[in-house]
Amino acid sequence: MKNLTDSFVYLGHWPSAGSFGFNTDILATNPINLSVVFGVLVFFGKGVLNDLLDNRKQRILNTIRNSEELREGAIQQLENARARLRKVETEADKFRVNGYSEIEREQLNLINSTYKTLKQLENYKNETILFEQQRTINQVRERVFQQALQGAIGTLNSCLSNELHLRTINANIGMFGTMKEITD
């Protein structure tokens, strides 16, 4: 703290008469000293300040230019992405429509093939029934024929005596004899 107050005391100290120096006491400086200091600052600082401002201006302009280029690139990428999105959506719609029509086509094919299979099964069933009916009819005919034959044989055996039997044989032999004479 003491150093701080000492520095204010030294600022208030005037240089001795006859010497040239700057008054470091800001409150006690006169306008001539201030104008000299400002003149030196303006003269030498003007170029530095202009260079600093020009550099800053160039950096800002470059940044704006780069930002504009990046913005243009981003807009172009956005447009490309939108175009790809529209293309993908169109293709998805095509696939969706084709998929639905493919499903409907497959469903129709399945219904048609099922109908054909059912029709074939119906035909096989009818053929099997017809075959079984024919087989049953043939079996019944065969049994009826066997029973009729057995009945006829039984009737013949009961009706025929040896004498009748011999006459029938002789009559048949006679018929064969006349047939032979006719054919010769």
Swiss-Prot record:
Keyword DNA-binding: no
Record keywords: ATP synthesis, CF(0), Chloroplast, Hydrogen ion transport, Ion transport, Membrane, Plastid, Thylakoid, Transmembrane, Transmembrane helix, Transport
UniProt-annotated location(s): Plastid, Chloroplast thylakoid membrane
InterPro entries assigned: ATP_synth_b/b'su_bac/chlpt (IPR002146)
Any GO MF annotation of the entry: proton-transporting ATP synthase activity, rotational mechanism
Taxonomic superkingdom: Eukaryota
Transmembrane segments: 27-49
Gene Ontology cellular component list: chloroplast thylakoid membrane; proton-transporting ATP synthase complex
Membrane topology, from the record: Single-pass membrane protein
Function: F(1)F(0) ATP synthase produces ATP from ADP in the presence of a proton or sodium gradient. F-type ATPases consist of two structural domains, F(1) containing the extramembraneous catalytic core and F(0) containing the membrane proton channel, linked together by a central stalk and a peripheral stalk. During catalysis, ATP synthesis in the catalytic domain of F(1) is coupled via a rotary mechanism of the central stalk subunits to proton translocation. Component of the F(0) channel, it forms part of the peripheral stalk, linking F(1) to F(0).
Family to which this protein belongs: Belongs to the ATPase B chain family.
More about this protein: In plastids the F-type ATPase is also known as CF(1)CF(0).
Quaternary structure (record): F-type ATPases have 2 components, F(1) - the catalytic core - and F(0) - the membrane proton channel. F(1) has five subunits: alpha(3), beta(3), gamma(1), delta(1), epsilon(1). F(0) has four main subunits: a(1), b(1), b'(1) and c(10-14). The alpha and beta chains form an alternating ring which encloses part of the gamma chain. F(1) is attached to F(0) by a central stalk formed by the gamma and epsilon chains, while a peripheral stalk is formed by the delta, b and b' chains.
Alphabetical list of PANTHER family matching this protein: ATP SYNTHASE SUBUNIT B, CHLOROPLASTIC
Protein name: ATP synthase subunit b, chloroplastic
Species whose genome carries this gene: Capsella bursa-pastoris (Shepherd's purse)
